[in-house]
């Protein structure tokens, strides 16, 4: 909130190249952050916390590298690094109030970090909150940097950390649960379905093994995009040339970030590409969208197989977690499936946002950076959270309704497929169509038509033998 909107807030005067401006006295931010608060009253979406923490990593690493290169007084550099470490730890999240909808380079958020960290460092060195002495937001915290390379670097750091520390473990958790169900259900034979119609048999375990494989492959595709995300733009400064940065800064900076995060970050080979495009994040979002597609299918299958309890497919019983209706007593809904599919719908929408925003690299700079960062980070976070929720509150508690599965299996006309190799497709189709028309069983019609004997039918039409290739 602007101090002008709340006169009771005590203020101090800060200044930038536009002149003086009043800032809440208890806040660590300065003039440029305050101007952004006043100029961009758009929505409620603040810069994501992982991005704020990543900006802290950038400032911490830059200060330490600049100290090593002789570009910063050691006392100032250490004060900046220590203050930035507090930002990384989330101790000052409430000092980062800026919304996503700001300048497309993220300049205001970069300056928000510079101002807060400089203010913290000034207090460390015996100075006062705010101001520009002894630590200056631009001259010291932003030394050898531009918003144009700092913000994309923070984007990559934030996304890589979230994928590595949050999403991939969540997918592993889901995969483990689905794989356990595949093994638990491996001996339960059920009717398969294609085009929403009866098909030949599968085991329930085989069906779940497909889900498990889909999750594993989705995670692998996401992991395969990380090398591009681990390449950092820092050192390109304003347009990719590296103006005002030490020749060794970029490589040393990437190594320092790798040391601080434990992730193998590198310096981007071509800084012009790293500033003007966000293809690496578009690529990652594509993999996230593919994962969302797969998770939607899995959740949809499970809720359909659990439909009922008396008038649906009813092959599965899903955990009953909460009442499902305010008007229908006793109704329970597949809420975890619904939550996951809504997450997937959001991620698919984010894919459209990121693809379009990624195309907006006009000349030397893409200026849709904050919306790309927000969309990708949201995709990663909600996919991770939903995967854990779906696992813990649904998948682990799924039970097979074996009586219902057996009943549906015994009435399926598609078991006739097993007869096709011996009597031919046309005769097998005739048996199925006649049984459907007359309301009789396959066996009754096969014997009446004289195409097989009782012994032949019993030997061939056995669902448990129809789950794998056969030489017979």
Swiss-Prot record:
What does this gene product do?
Involved in the TCA cycle. Catalyzes the stereospecific interconversion of fumarate to L-malate.
Locate the region Disordered: 1-20, 127-149
Q: Which reaction(s) does its UniProt entry say it catalyses?
A: (S)-malate = fumarate + H2O
The annotated site for Important for catalytic activity falls at: 338
Pathway annotation from the record: Carbohydrate metabolism; tricarboxylic acid cycle; (S)-malate from fumarate: step 1/1
Provide the family line: Belongs to the class-II fumarase/aspartase family. Fumarase subfamily.
Active site: which residues? Answer: 195, 325
Keywords from the UniProt entry: Cytoplasm, Lyase, Tricarboxylic acid cycle
Q: GO terms for CC?
A: cytoplasm
Q: Which residues make up the binding site for substrate?
A: 105-107, 136-139, 146-148, 194, 326, 331-333
Q: Name one GO biological process term.
A: tricarboxylic acid cycle
EC number, UniProt record = 4.2.1.2
Assembly: Homotetramer.
Q: Which domain of life is it from?
A: Bacteria
Extra remark? There are 2 substrate-binding sites: the catalytic A site, and the non-catalytic B site that may play a role in the transfer of substrate or product between the active site and the solvent. Alternatively, the B site may bind allosteric effectors.
Annotated compartments:
Cytoplasm
Q: What is this protein called?
A: Fumarate hydratase class II
Q: Which GO terms describe its molecular function?
A: fumarate hydratase activity
List the source organism: Methylorubrum extorquens (strain ATCC 14718 / DSM 1338 / JCM 2805 / NCIMB 9133 / AM1) (Methylobacterium extorquens)
Q: Which Pfam families match?
A: FumaraseC_C, Lyase_1
């Amino acid at each position: 909130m602007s101090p002008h909107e709340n006169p009771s807030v005590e203020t101090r005067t800060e200044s930038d190249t536009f002149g003086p401006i009043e800032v809440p006295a208890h806040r660590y931010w300065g003039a440029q952050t305050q101007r952004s608060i006043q100029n961009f009253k758009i929505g409620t979406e603040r810069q994501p916390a992982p991005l704020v923490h990543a900006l802290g990593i950038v400032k911490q690493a830059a200060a330490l590298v600049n100290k090593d290169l002789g570009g910063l007084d050691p006392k100032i550099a250490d004060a900046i690094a220590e203050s930035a470490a507090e930002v990384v730890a989330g101790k000052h999240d409430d000092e980062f109030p800026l919304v996503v909808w700001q300048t497309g380079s993220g300049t205001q958020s970069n300056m928000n970090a510079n101002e807060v960290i400089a203010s913290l460092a000034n207090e460390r060195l015996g100075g006062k909150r705010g101001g520009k002495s002894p630590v200056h937001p631009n001259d010291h915290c932003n030394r050898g940097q531009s918003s144009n390379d700092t913000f994309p670097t923070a984007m990559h750091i934030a996304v890589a950390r979230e994928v590595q520390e949050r999403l991939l473990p969540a997918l592993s958790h889901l995969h483990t649960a689905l794989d356990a169900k595949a093994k638990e259900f491996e001996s339960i034979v059920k009717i398969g379905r294609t085009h929403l119609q009866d098909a030949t048999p599968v085991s329930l375990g085989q069906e779940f093994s497909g889900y498990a494989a889909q999750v594993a492959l989705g995670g692998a595709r996401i992991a395969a995009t990380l090398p591009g995300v681990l390449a950092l733009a820092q050192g390109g400064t304003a347009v990719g040339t590296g103006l005002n940065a030490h020749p060794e800064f970029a490589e040393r900076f990437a190594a320092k970030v790798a040391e601080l995060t434990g992730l193998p970050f590198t310096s981007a080979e071509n800084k012009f590409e790293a500033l003007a495009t966000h293809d690496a994040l578009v690529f990652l979002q594509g993999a996230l969208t593919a994962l969302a597609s797969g998770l939607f299918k899995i959740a949809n299958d499970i809720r359909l197989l659990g439909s009922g309890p008396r008038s649906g497919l009813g092959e599965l019983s899903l955990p009953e977690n909460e009442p499902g209706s305010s008007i229908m007593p006793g109704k329970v809904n597949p809420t975890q499936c619904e939550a996951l599919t809504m997450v997937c719908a959001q991620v698919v929408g984010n894919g459209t946002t990121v693809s379009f925003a990624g195309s907006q690299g006009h000349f030397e700079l893409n200026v849709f950076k904050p919306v790309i960062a927000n969309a990708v980070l949201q995709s990663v976070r909600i996919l991770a959270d939903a995967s854990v929720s779906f696992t813990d509150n649904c998948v682990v508690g799924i039970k097979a309704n074996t009586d219902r599965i057996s009943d549906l299996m015994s009435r399926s006309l598609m078991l006739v497929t097993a007869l096709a190799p011996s009597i031919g497709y046309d005769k097998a189709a005739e048996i199925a169509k006649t049984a459907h028309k007359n309301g009789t069983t396959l066996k009754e019609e096969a014997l009446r038509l004289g195409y097989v004997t009782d012994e032949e039918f019993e030997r061939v039409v056995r669902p448990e033998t129809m789950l794998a290739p056969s030489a017979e």
